[in-house]
Amino acid sequence: MENQVLTPHVYWAQRHHELYLRVELSDVQNPAISITENVLHFKAQGHGAKGDNVYEFHLEFLDLVKPEPVYKLTQRQVNITVQKKESQWWERLTKQEKRPLFLAPDFDRWLDESDAEMELRAKEEEQLNKLRLESQGSPETLTSLKKGYLFMYNLVQFLGFSWIFVNMTVRFFILGKESFYDTFHTVADMMYFCQMLAAVESINAAIGVTKSPVVPSLFQLLGRNFILFIIFGTMEEMQNKAVVFFVFYIWSTVEIFRYPFYMLSCIDMDWKVLTWLRYTVWIPLYPMGCLAEAVSVIQSIPVFNETGRFSFTLPYPVKIKVRFSFFLQIYLILLFLGLYVNFRYLYKQRRRRFGQKKKKIH
């Protein structure tokens, strides 16, 4: 009777251009590792789950790979790197849909697709920045200037939103609910300043000064400025409503944790309490802020209908009057889409920061 074929535990991960396999065998001797007809063949003497024996396995890859695997032996395992022929993301490792029992994801090395794309972009940006720095001057000087600029920007924003937060808090304790109705006239100038300055964040992300993705910051910037400049700024009837207080208070609460975190990051400091707050307070505050903004839009619809502001009539032969409230209803949909985009981005940031378990990947 033929001896039973023993297979070792194999863990895999990927990037767009290569595959990583970790074979759990210690004290490996005489390894035979090759790729023929897109099938990886492995056979070696080593100590695995069944003791000191000969272990082997074969894996037919999902897509084409280069036939020259690179492997490295350590005392505890065998690390194999295989280059993909085309740089792309694979939905699984093997051609067969059912995963072999001995194969599992290597969560220590795994990144999901969006993370891998961010890593790829970061590497490309790093190379481009390196070339720019070599041609422009001392890397240390430019890095110091960049950190100084970002530190001052975040400091100014922190002071601005702190002033708004403290002012509104003190007035609430002194005046109670009466403070709700003149919030706009009290803090609007500072909010205008902070929100106009917030455009710099999207510019920084777009030109590569920071590594933040452009889309989430742009969604937040456009959404807030639409509420501030269009809903509140152009309609005096909206400026005396209580919803202004809740919108401004939630915005400022989020920012008095976010900007100090960025300030400390500029000087390579990590205050654990602040870090936890920065990656946690948004969980209740972002939905609350979205709800408050939605209420302000809904309350403004009859006001815009009554005044006819920003409404227009299509030219002949259509001659249909298009009310601005129609666009506000569309905006309500976009508002919750923006919440989803930002929520997803911030959740992934939090997951990476605190090392939560990644989803199971086949």
Curated annotation (Swiss-Prot):
Residues 1-149, 211-212, 264-280, 347-362 are cytoplasmic. It catalyses: a very-long-chain (3R)-3-hydroxyacyl-CoA = a very-long-chain (2E)-enoyl-CoA + H2O; (3R)-hydroxyhexadecanoyl-CoA = (2E)-hexadecenoyl-CoA + H2O. Keywords: Acetylation, Coiled coil, Endoplasmic reticulum, Fatty acid biosynthesis, Fatty acid metabolism, Lipid biosynthesis, Lipid metabolism, Lyase, Membrane, Phosphoprotein, Transmembrane, Transmembrane helix. The active site is at Y286, E293. The keyword Lipid metabolism applies. It holds the Pfam family PTPLA. Residues 111-136 form a coiled coil. It is an enzyme of class 4 (lyase). Residues 5-94 form the CS domain. The modification Phosphothreonine is found at T7. Pathway: Lipid metabolism; fatty acid biosynthesis. SUPFAM superfamilies: HSP20-like chaperones. This is Very-long-chain (3R)-3-hydroxyacyl-CoA dehydratase 3. It comes from Bos taurus (Bovine). The gene is HACD3.
